[in-house]
């Protein structure tokens, strides 16, 4: 389930994102020259077929920082959302973000890669978590629906 709608920065006490193991992250393709590495924790991927949403934890690692985000992709319409974030090993905090266009002004290129490489099959959510993991690991090129 999505964390309750809380103001950005509010500590989550319920609806916490799933636990993850940084040693198991699936590295996601980044633009050449990027100093940030992004990985998806495969054990956190879940599918809500009724809502058409894939949820997951992404971990961004840079030279001096590590941030994890609990996110979702809504394939039908090409939208994404950050539900919560945490710095290093700190507490999960509500992100205060609504659903946004994957191609909008606040878009993140890696989100489109996730949709393309396994989370979405055209405008539909991929309901097979194992297939999503395989697609992300192999860089599979599924057709992304542009809403």
Per-region residue spans from a language model:
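Residue-identity detector for glutamine
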Residues: 30, 50, 79, 87, ...
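Generic structural hydrophobic/aromatic packing signal, biased to beta-strands
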Residues: 28, 56, 80-83, 120
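Mature, folded catalytic cores of secreted/periplasmic enzymes
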Residues: 33, 81, 145-147
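N-terminal secretory signal peptides
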Residues: 1-72
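A short, surface-exposed interaction/processing loop segment used at functional sites
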Residues: 77-103
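C-terminal partner/receptor-binding element of secreted or periplasmic proteins
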Residues: 93-147
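General "foldedness" signal
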Residues: 42, 70, 85-87, 94-96, ...
